[in-house]
């Protein structure tokens, strides 16, 4: 019998639990647009009461459609309805004293505030984050701003597009081709990422339990730098060169089958060998140069794919265990059997549009079944009495006292443990001497070098503050030791394919027998069930399967995989699910399984594609470097050369308001073409985009990038130099905020590692306190803590159960 493709929202999760994880927490939402709304949506899903405070005109998101669909009077946009389900709306007119007093009363009753820059109410100094916290010192106040609340750029104009450029994310891991402009990641992803970080920061500050409140300062620039690049500063510091010097398109990558687009990839050397056999060219395996220079093979691979249907390509790739996925978009997403089986998409209770379901699933507690998003000012009277919740223990850092067994590898899983470790948790990173974390070997360090496995820059950046343990749990003695460690841990995080732990007797049901209150986070690529359950998942495949790839690239070419975002985004959402499970355990003493599927997390931040198609029949697609938020918006080549002497310097310009257009005109010297009246409004500029682009390109080509940035910023226009990722460290704003910290490593020396894109007012000190662990560095320490004596530990090493050197499998 066919599985229903969608589910009603009230059926998303069981609804019989007496309390939700965040029951009793009240959050006042003083934000506009996507980032703040997504933050509070995630909190609302967890059971928090969200009171959205709006000026009389309402949040501009109410009338937003990325496809320019007409929102009838009295209705709200479908994206607004998705992001604001289960919230309350209160109108506060800043010009009315009674309303101002009412807002103060509301803030007194709250536990937290989420704030972003916006019109009217939020421009009042008294309603800025410092003013709110000063008047209501019990609150956790989370601010979301382009550059952070302090620093030389804190008041500079920016858009999500220009922030991608500043943070290096517009280049990413050398995305694109050298003969064209770079291409940004479409879909306003930076706003969604900032919203997820804001949710993590808010929950972490609430968990700390300090009675004096806290300011959590989220920087969208730092969020983009964290998630849209691959630790490029640490990479260059350690190895002396950037990961790549030229843009490129992966081969294999996005391929055109006879009836649609598919994504293929080779994340390991073995997968490349298998791919060569699959496409009928085993001779490619004999030429090691082709492994690194595969672009020459692209036409042959394209011809192979073109002779097959999507289903045939995907089936063959699955048979060879080659990472694969269809290229998903808003029109086809809900048609795939895997998503139908898992009921990934749900119907919105207000407008009936398709929405992605929550990005994680919890076994022992519920998420709130969403109720319709509120009309503007729908709740005119609210209870004034603050809800008293159980007193929370006070912690030096948000996760002090939490012990975590980190059974993860590469990026998505270790990212979870890294955030926990930076914020105080005792995180034990588990590897084996025969199968270390694969990211240790990313970077191209020759295996002829001594201790080559200790020189991976990505591992060094992603695992600071952790302790390192090696255990071969394929051996029964190793598996037994894992279980013994679990008895001492609050949390286990793992990101193997589902069958690995299931076959090892280390699944949740087995581990909860030895630790009943265990919180276990499982991070499969596609879920613990469904047709794609056992498919290998790398970041680029998750991007293909979620719509991230579809929105990235030039409209006259195949889409480009962002090639990084799928991993850290999965880690962000797993962290939120984990924090909700911990809140549930704090209330009830009950453990929980958190299923934080990578593709579900990605589908949430690309929700707009499915929503627009379902609600309006609109097909959202990639537009190069243009976008729905601004016109003109594009990259323009500047004068000068890059650090390798190439004519490849670009600036990003985005005019999001009419006022900014007038500023741009002044910066240009008010040339006659720019004074045409049709350009005074967004619609006219959008229609004349080609003409404006040509004029701006000519103006920029005659000027250095820094000169362009200075002129346009002075005129109030969002602008950025397109930064090479490893040059993040040159940004004065990041330097002012201490985004990078120096970390000493016993093998590779001193390098700079990024911190987190949020600052906690009660944790001003450095975040990095220990270098990433050497392989098995803390074996003796940890096994001794477990009660093993030196003779037992020596025997384990002699038998290869533990080790401190990389060895070939026995």
PLM-predicted stretches and their roles:
Residues 57, 146-148, 220-226, 259, ...:
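Glycine-rich beta-alpha junction loops
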Residues 80, 242-247, 252-253, 350-353, ...:
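Short Gly/Pro-enriched turn/cap motifs at secondary-structure boundaries
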Residues 319-370, 714-768, 808:
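A glycine-rich dinucleotide-binding beta-alpha-beta segment and adjacent secondary-structure elements
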Residues 286-298, 328-337, 353, 675-687, ...:
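Short linear loop/turn motifs
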Residues 205-242, 326, 330, 581-625, ...:
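Substrate-binding/catalytic subdomain of NAD(P)-dependent oxidoreductase enzymes
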Residues 182-193, 243, 249-252, 261-263, ...:
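A short glycine-threonine-serine/GTX helix/turn-capping micro-motif
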Residues 246, 250-320, 324, 331, ...:
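Aromatic-enriched alpha-helical interface/lid elements that frame and gate functional surfaces
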Residues 2-212, 236, 303, 311, ...:
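N-terminal helix-loop segment corresponding to the beta1-alpha1 unit
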């Amino acid at each position: 019998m066919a599985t229903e493709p969608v589910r009603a929202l009230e059926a998303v999760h069981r609804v019989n639990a007496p309390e939700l994880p965040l029951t009793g927490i009240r959050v006042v939402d003083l934000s506009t647009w996507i980032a703040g709304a997504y933050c509070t949506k995630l909190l609302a899903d967890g059971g928090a009461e969200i009171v959205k405070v709006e000026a009389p005109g309402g949040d501009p998101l109410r009338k937003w459609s990325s496809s320019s669909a007409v929102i009838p009077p009295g209705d709200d946009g479908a994206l607004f309805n998705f992001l604001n389900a289960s919230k309350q709306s209160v109108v506060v007119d800043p010009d009315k004293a009674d309303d101002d007093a009412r807002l103060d009363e509301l803030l007194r009753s709250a536990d937290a505030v989420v704030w972003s820059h916006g019109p009217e109410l939020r421009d009042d100094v008294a309603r800025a984050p410092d003013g709110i916290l000063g008047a209501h010192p019990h609150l956790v106040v989370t601010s979301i701003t382009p550059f952070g609340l302090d620093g030389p750029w804190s008041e500079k104009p920016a858009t999500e597009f220009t922030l991608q450029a500043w943070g290096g994310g517009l280049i990413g891991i050398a995305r694109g081709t050298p003969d064209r402009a770079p291409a940004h990641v479409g879909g306003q992803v930076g706003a969604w990422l900032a919203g997820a970080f804001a949710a993590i920061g808010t929950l972490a500050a609430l968990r700390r339990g300090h009675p004096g409140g806290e300011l959590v300062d989220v920087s969208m620039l730092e969020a983009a730098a964290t998630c849209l690049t691959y630790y490029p500063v640490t990479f260059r510091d350690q190895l002396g060169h950037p990961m790549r010097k030229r843009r490129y398109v992966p081969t294999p990558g996005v391929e055109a089958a006879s009836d649609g687009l598919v994504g293929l990839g080779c994340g390991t050397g073995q997968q490349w060998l298998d791919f060569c056999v699959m496409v009928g060219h085993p001779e490619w395996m004999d030429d090691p140069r082709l492994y690194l220079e595969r672009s020459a093979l692209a036409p042959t691979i394209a011809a192979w794919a073109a002779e097959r249907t999507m289903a045939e390509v995907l089936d063959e790739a699955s048979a060879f265990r080659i990472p694969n996925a269809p290229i998903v978009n808003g029109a086809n997403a809900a048609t795939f059997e895997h998503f139908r089986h898992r009921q990934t998409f749900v119907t919105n209770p207000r407008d009936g549009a398709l929405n992605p379901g929550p990005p994680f699933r919890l076994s022992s507690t519920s998420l709130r079944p969403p109720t319709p998003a509120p009309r503007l000012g729908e709740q005119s009277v609210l209870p004034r009495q603050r809800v008293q919740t159980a007193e929370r223990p006070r912690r030096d850092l948000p996760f002090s006292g939490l012990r975590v067994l980190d059974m993860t590898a590469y990026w998505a899983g270790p990212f979870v443990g890294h955030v926990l470790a930076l914020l105080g948790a005792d995180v034990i990173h588990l590897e084996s001497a025969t199968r270390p974390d694969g990211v240790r070997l990313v970077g191209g360090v020759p295996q002829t070098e001594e201790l080559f496995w200790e020189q991976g820059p990505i591992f060094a950046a992603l695992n600071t503050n952790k302790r390192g343990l090696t255990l071969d749990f394929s051996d029964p003695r190793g598996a037994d030791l894992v279980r013994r460690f679990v008895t001492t841990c609050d949390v286990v995080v793992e990101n193997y394919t589902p069958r690995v732990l299931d076959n090892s007797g280390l699944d949740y049901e087995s581990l909860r027998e030895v630790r009943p209150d265990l919180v276990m986070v499982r991070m499969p690529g596609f879920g613990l069930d469904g047709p794609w359950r056992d498919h290998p998942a790398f970041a680029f495949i998750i991007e293909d399967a979620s719509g991230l790839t579809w929105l990235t690239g030039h409209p006259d070419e195949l889409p480009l995989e962002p090639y990084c975002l799928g991993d850290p985004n999965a880690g962000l959402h797993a962290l939120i699910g984990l924090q909700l499970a911990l809140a549930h355990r704090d209330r009830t003493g009950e453990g929980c399984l958190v299923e934080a599927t990578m593709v579900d997390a990605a589908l949430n931040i690309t929700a707009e594609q499915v929503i627009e198609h379902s609600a309006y029949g609109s097909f959202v697609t990639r537009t190069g470097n243009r976008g729905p938020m601004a016109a003109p918006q594009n990259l323009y080549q500047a004068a000068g050369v890059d650090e390798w002497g190439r004519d490849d310097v670009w600036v990003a310009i985005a005019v999001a308001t009419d006022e900014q257009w007038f500023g741009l005109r002044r910066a240009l010297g008010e040339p006659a073409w720019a004074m045409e009246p049709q350009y005074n409004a967004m619609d006219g500029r959008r229609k004349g985009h080609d003409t404006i682009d040509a004029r701006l390109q000519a103006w920029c080509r005659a000027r250095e990038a820094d000169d362009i940035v200075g002129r346009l910023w002075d005129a109030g226009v969002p602008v950025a130099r397109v930064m090479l990722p490893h040059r993040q460290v040159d940004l004065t704003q990041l330097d002012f905020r201490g985004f990078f910290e120096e970390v000493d490593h016993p093998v590779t020396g001193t390098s700079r590692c990024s911190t987190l894109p949020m600052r906690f007012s009660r944790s001003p000190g450095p975040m990095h306190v220990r270098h990433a662990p050497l392989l098995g560095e803390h074996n003796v320490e940890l096994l001794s803590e477990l009660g093993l004596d030196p003779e037992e530990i020596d025997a384990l090493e002699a038998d290869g159960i533990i080790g401190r050197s990389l060895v070939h499998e026995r």
